[in-house]
Amino acid sequence: MRSDSRLSRMLHVLLHMDRYQKPVTSEMIAGMLSTNPVVVRRTMAGLRDQGYVRSEKGHHGGWTLVKPLSEIALLDVYQAIGEPELFAIGPASDHPECLVEQAVNNAVGDTLREAEALILARLKAVTLGDLAGEFERRYAKLGASGPMPEICSD
């Protein structure tokens, strides 16, 4: 089963956009993510609708951040991309009248609800600014010299 990496990928994109400090085209983002610019525009539209990014058309156009990273929580991005399923597992519905299935579903459902609440609370507590700080600490630890990377590419 393939995992849904949209959240991680969009967090990655937003951090690069902050570093780049210029409009980033859908084509640039698509190249970074090895996907189609149409997919990028569709995903970025959710972020735009929530007021985290804006898009400018034209020769020097592209996507830019509207808010500072410190004001965007991971939960904000998760919600803006459509709140993808957190778990691939879930209750069964083959035999809803079966008391065994009901007991199993009750236990699994309760556990998943508790786990989801913990995950969402953590996503709410962490900002993109926190992630940027973690990146900068990791970069400094390398002892690297020269400019920091702006946009990933193949």
How would you label these PLM feature ranges?
Residues 69-94, 112-113:
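Conserved segment of winged-helix/HTH DNA-binding domains
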Residues 96-154:
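C-terminal regulatory/oligomerization modules of transcriptional regulators
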Residues 50-66:
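Beta-hairpin "wing" of winged helix-turn-helix
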Residues 1-33:
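Extreme N-terminal segment that seeds HTH/winged-HTH DNA-binding domains in transcriptional regulators
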